[in-house]
Amino acid sequence: MTFTNTFKRKVCRVIAALAAVACTMSLAACGADETGKIRIGIKFDQPGLGFKKSGTYVGFDVDVAKYIAKKLGYSEDQIIWKEAPSKQREAMLQNGDVDMILATYSITDERKKAVSFAGPYFVAGQDLLVRKDDNSINGPEDLNGKRLCSVTGSTSAATVKEKFASEVQLMEQPGYAECATALFSGIVDAVTTDDIILAGLASASRGKLKVVGKPFTQEHYGVGIKKGDTQLATKINNAIVDMIQDGSWENAISDNTKGTNYTPDVRYNPPTPDEGEEA
């Protein structure tokens, strides 16, 4: 009897241990049930695009994601938002951690080796953010002798130095908020990245910063999905077309760039979403 009870206790402990391991491997099976929901990766730290604020999520990428999810049959309550840092986006899709990613995710041939895209849902252009009262910087060629901030790991500042202003002084910060702070305080003269990201920062500055408004590159923002899922790409593209046609796309741009006078480059926007579909 003693042996039997001891054996049972050992078996129970083994089962409990295995269950704990299973929980760490599959959240969907242990409490955080994701059945019937859609998991969407966004940025949590980009004002105007993807920003986590008091437990809610706001921004243009968020608005586009909500619209797409609704067209796919999911309510806002059925969306599970997951942070998608730039360096982790491909891995998150490959590992099945998310169903799609909308996180200023530029469509490139290199990335398409690992994942697929739908879209584009927006075409951004590299631009400059300056102080509201600074009229000396009207384009990248005006940055010689100036101090320019960009985010660590970005190639945007190097592009300016190589192509437009060889004498610009470069400074890196871990995030755009830190670059904006450096701009506020006069440590740098400008910040560079995609124009819509800069517009979000300008909107959050309450009129203290402005976007120069002369983009000099093109970045096609796509919806990252698992490689080869052409059916999902088609559905997402159809949703983006609907969003553009019913005015929701334009409203989302306006709502998330208030007070900046920001206008997307009309040469490329609104875009034609045809990425990822079967030929």
Region locations from a protein language model:
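Extracytoplasmic small-molecule ligand-binding "clamshell" domains
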Residues: 34-102
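Bilobed "Venus flytrap"/periplasmic-binding protein-like clamshell domains
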Residues: 44-47, 57-70, 127-180, 190, ...
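Ligand-binding clefts/hinges and TM-proximal coupling segments of bilobed small-molecule sensing domains
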Residues: 78, 155-171, 210-211, 241-279
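Acidic, polar ligand-binding/catalytic clefts
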Residues: 79-142
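Extended ligand-binding regions for polar small-molecule ligands
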Residues: 63-71, 134, 154, 223-262
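A ligand-binding cleft/hinge motif common to bilobed small-molecule-binding domains
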Residues: 88, 104-113, 161-162, 184-185, ...
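Periplasmic-binding protein-like
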Residues: 122-130, 199, 203-237, 260-279
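C-terminal motif of bacterial Sec signal peptides marking the signal peptidase cleavage site
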Residues: 25-29
